[in-house]
Each structure stands twice: as C-alpha cells, then as structure tokens.
C-alpha cells in the first residue's frame, strides 16, 4: 500500500476534535470524495454511522461537503458497517460511507468508504480523494447541489437480508441466546433477527447513550456476556463490536469462542455440506491450533497480513470464500462482501441446530495453543521495532520456543501501539512470561 496522508488500513480514524476528525476536515473530505465519485456516474451516496454522539456532527459535515460537490446523501441512521455495504449494493449507490471507530472508545471516530459493489474502496480511489483534498473547495451551481434524504426502512431491509442467510428449513426455536450489542450499531438489529428466527433472546449492551459504546461490553470485553450466559442458563452468547463487523461468542459453559474457532466451525460445516470452495484464510495472528485443525480435515489454510482488507485480498487471490481474523472479523463471500458479525453468528448457529451440537462440542476438534498478546503504547516518535534490544530479546524467546511456537511483533494500523504476540506449545504462564519480556523491551525502546 502506498504512503498516504490520511487513509489508514481501515479508513480515516482519530480522536474527535483533533485532526483529522474535525468538522472542517470532514466537510472537505465529503467534498473531495464527491468530486472523485461523481466522475463515475451515480449521484447518490449512502451514509451510515454507529451510536457515538459525534456521529451527528460528522454526518452533517459529510453531507454538506457532498452536496457542494453535487452528490446527494441517503442517511441510514445508526446501522452496522456491513449493513451500509449491503445497502450500497442494493441502492446501486456510487459509494457508502460509515462513520465509526469500530471497537475504539466513544471519543474516537472515523470515516470509511465502500465502493458500489460493497467492498472497501480501491487504493487508487482513496489516493484520488487525498489528491482532491489539496485543492481549494468549490461549489457547484445552485441547481446542481445535492440533496439529503433518509432511508426509512433501512433496518428492516438489513434484518431481512440477515435472516436470508439462515436456512429456511431450520429455526432457533430451541435456543436461548444472550446477545451483547456493545451499545453500538447492532442494538436494534441483532435481537430482532434472532427473535424472528425463533430464539429466546436476552439482551445486554442494547441501550446506547452516545458515550457507552464498547464500554466494558461487546466483542472486545466478553466478561459480562460470560456471566450472563451462565446466570441465564443460555445455550450460547453472541457479542458484536460497536459497528457490528466483529463477532465473539460464548459457549454454555462460559468459555469465549474467538474468530479462529468461528472460522474452524464454519469451514468444517462447509466441508460437511459439500459447500466449501477451496480453503480458508487467516492472518499472521491466527492461532497455530487453527492451522493444525484445518490440516487434519484436509482444508488448505493460508495467512494474510493482519487487517480484514488483506484477508479479503487473499481470499480473492485464491478464489476462496471464507476467511477471518481471530479478533472476530469473519468474511463469508457466499453471503456478503465484508466482515459481518450477525451473518457469521447465524452460520455458527446453523451448525449447532443442524448437527444438534453445542457450541462447546463444535469447538472440540480444535485445540488452541496458548497465545499471549500484549499491547504496548508508544510515543510515535521512534519505532521500537528497530531497537537492537528488542531484536535481541525476540531472538532469545524464539530460541527458547525451539520451533514449537511463534513470535510476532507489529505496529497497529489505527493506534500508536506495538502488538506483541507469543504463541507456543507450552504452559500459558511460560508463554506470558516470554511475551512480557519482549513487551518490557519495547516499552524501554519506545
């Protein structure tokens, strides 16, 4: 990927009120995007958002910029990211824009774009938008200004789409499900989908106030979900992140089930049904246990760079249909075009119902190796990964693992963090000690 000024691995993101997430920047971004996208013909753009309080301000700024460029906006209101991708396709809009910072705290926000086919914008289009940003803002003639309208049935359209990915001959009548919507964009979608398919649904994280998104709930913190599943005697729990493109699950015993395990279940079920096309794509962070379990099933597996866009690129390159990150981004190209937490969850529930198996039993064919991830915040002025001390400690740990594990150090694409991952076939306490040793060296270098 080329060196761009504003766009990162997942759009543009930052703290609200600080560059680049300011009203004036976002207005200019809307205008620049409008100028570039108008060249392709369509004059309408879908705009969705999660439940952050800043979403109101930013969608107004975006709409003003688009209107000045002559494009009209169609607002969905709070809506999961994959719903915006879906609506962009069905409305034949030139693009979709999501205002969200995904799993980040409420005081962050971001902007990401989808193309007309519901996939993320190609690099060259993002680069063209950045180039347009450098030009002075102009306004089309009054008669050519864009308009703004609301898609009044956006939620209902997406609910029906999600239900359509669940087999019509099955139902969820026998399941009690706890769903945690992270006080985010799925709060009015996921419970309805599950109830309409017959499940008994208990909700948590479904009361957004603009500031409680992802706060001690959702896919990034499943402790509350684990407690509630056990307290309610539920069969399963589902947790989404703030914008609904990630999924974590909890089995009836309170165990967390991550993106690697979800990918394993979906791949194995696809194989059983004769519907698996090729293999499965994971990432550099995928647990080695996933690779070994898929190998036992004869399912090919490759690792992409971390980031759902890279998973998708690898899937397209291979012609494969399923891929996931262990963080819970699950992409199922036979169902949709981007990571979709609700759709992924429905495929796991399908496997449970069809095979009369618990989530715990579905996971039993895959043994997760101990994997410790430590996030180290740094100033951003120096790259700790280039430190001689960090390299030396990393070499020592790799030698101790003796070929029975992996060490991975990488910079986050969205935050000033170094992610330290150590994985191996050893006691978890030993793996944690190794990871903390490297993390301490990174802290000292940062």
From Swiss-Prot:
Residues making up the signal peptide according to the UniProt record: none
EC number: 5.4.2.10
Annotated CDD domains: GlmM (cd05802)
Catalytic site positions: 102 (phosphoserine intermediate)
GO molecular function, one term: phosphoglucosamine mutase activity
Gene3D superfamilies reported for this sequence: Alpha-D-Glucose-1,6-Bisphosphate, subunit A, domain 3, Alpha-D-phosphohexomutase, C-terminal domain
HAMAP family assigned to the protein according to its UniProt record, in alphabetical order: GlmM_B
Protein family: Belongs to the phosphohexose mutase family.
Name of the protein described by the UniProt record: Phosphoglucosamine mutase
Gene (UniProt): glmM
């Amino acid at each position: 990927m080329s060196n761009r000024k504003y766009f990162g691995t997942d759009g543009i993101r930052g703290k609200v009120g600080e560059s680049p997430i300011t009203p004036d920047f976002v207005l200019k971004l809307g205008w620049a995007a409008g100028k570039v996208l108008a060249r392709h013909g369509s004059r309408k753009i879908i705009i969705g958002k999660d439940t952050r309080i800043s979403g109101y301000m930013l969608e107004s700024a975006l709409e003003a910029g688009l209107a000045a460029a002559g494009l009209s906006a169609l607002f969905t209101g709070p809506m999961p990211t994959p719903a915006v991708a879906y609506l962009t396709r069905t409305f034949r809009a030139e693009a979709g824009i999501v205002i969200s910072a995904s799993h980040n705290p409420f005081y962050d926000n971001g902007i990401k774009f989808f193309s007309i086919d519901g996939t993320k914008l190609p690099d060259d289009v993002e680069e063209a938008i950045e180039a347009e940003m450098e030009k002075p803002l102009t306004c089309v003639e009054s008669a050519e200004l864009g308009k703004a309208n609301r898609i009044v049935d956006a939620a209902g359209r997406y609910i029906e789409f999600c239900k359509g990915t669940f087999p019509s001959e099955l139902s969820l009548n026998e399941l009690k499900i706890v769903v945690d919507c992270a006080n985010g964009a799925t709060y009015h979608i996921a419970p309805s989908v599950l109830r309409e398919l017959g499940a008994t649904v208990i909700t948590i994280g479904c009361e957004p106030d603009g500031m409680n998104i992802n706060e001690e709930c959702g896919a990034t913190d499943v402790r509350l979900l684990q407690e509630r599943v056990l307290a309610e005697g539920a069969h399963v729990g589902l947790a989404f992140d703030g914008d609904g493109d990630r999924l974590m699950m909890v089995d009836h015993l309170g165990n967390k089930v991550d993106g690697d395990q979800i990918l394993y279940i979906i791949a194995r079920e696809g194989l059983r049904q004769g519907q698996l096309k090729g293999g499965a794509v994971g990432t550099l962070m995928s647990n080695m246990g996933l690779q070994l379990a898929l190998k036992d099933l004869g399912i090919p597996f490759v690792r992409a760079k971390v980031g759902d866009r890279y998973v998708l690129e690898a899937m397209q390159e291979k012609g494969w249909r399923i891929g996931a990150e262990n963080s819970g981004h699950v992409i199922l190209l036979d169902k949709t075009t981007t990571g979709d937490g609700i759709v992924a969850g429905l495929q796991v529930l399908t496997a449970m119902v069809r095979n009369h198996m618990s989530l715990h039993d579905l996971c039993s064919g895959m043994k997760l190796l101990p994997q410790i991830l430590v996030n180290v915040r740094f100033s951003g002025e120096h790259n700790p990964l280039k430190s001689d001390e960090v390299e030396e400690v990393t070499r020592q740990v790799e030698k101790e693992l003796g070929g029975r594990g992996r060490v991975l150090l990488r910079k986050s694409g969205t935050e000033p963090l170094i992610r330290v991952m150590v994985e191996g076939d050893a006691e978890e306490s030993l793996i944690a000690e190794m990871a903390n040793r490297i993390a301490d060296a990174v802290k000292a270098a940062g």
